[in-house]
């Protein structure tokens, strides 16, 4: 009877110890190690998972859009700043020109009237006004297949044998 009490106490003690650690036989069998995972897999919490590369196209489909946004947004920001300060820069350039008396102020260039194009918002004229019809003429005279000279003689060399 004493032996039964010892075996029961040992079983109870080891059972409580294993439950306190939270480790069972099934969990130790499912945990993986770096050596146990095949190539291309890494050890996750309880199993081997495929490796994820940071810029793998299968994992990140929007890589191109992210790179494009990282390039375009700073350029747009710089352009907005330049357009914000651009009128001030042109006024400063004119002020510098006026302060410096050695450089003459150039008058604005005037384009000749021939090079100025004016667009109107009116609809275009009808086709009959744009295309000028030629007056009807007489039909051309009929043509002959044989060329003739001024007096009805044949042109070219005359062969003595014919």
Swiss-Prot record:
Keyword line: Membrane, Signal, Transmembrane, Transmembrane helix
Disulfide cysteine pairs (residue numbers): none
Membrane topology of this protein: Single-pass type I membrane protein
Signal peptide: 1-22
UniProt region (Disordered), positions on chain: 134-162
Coiled coil: none
Chief site of localization: membrane
Residues in the Cytoplasmic compartment per record: 85-162
Extracellular side: 23-63
Residue ranges crossing the lipid bilayer per the database entry: 64-84
GO cellular component annotations of the record: membrane
Keyword Transcription attached: no
Record localization: Membrane
Protein name as annotated: Transmembrane protein 92
Organism expressing this protein natively: Mus musculus
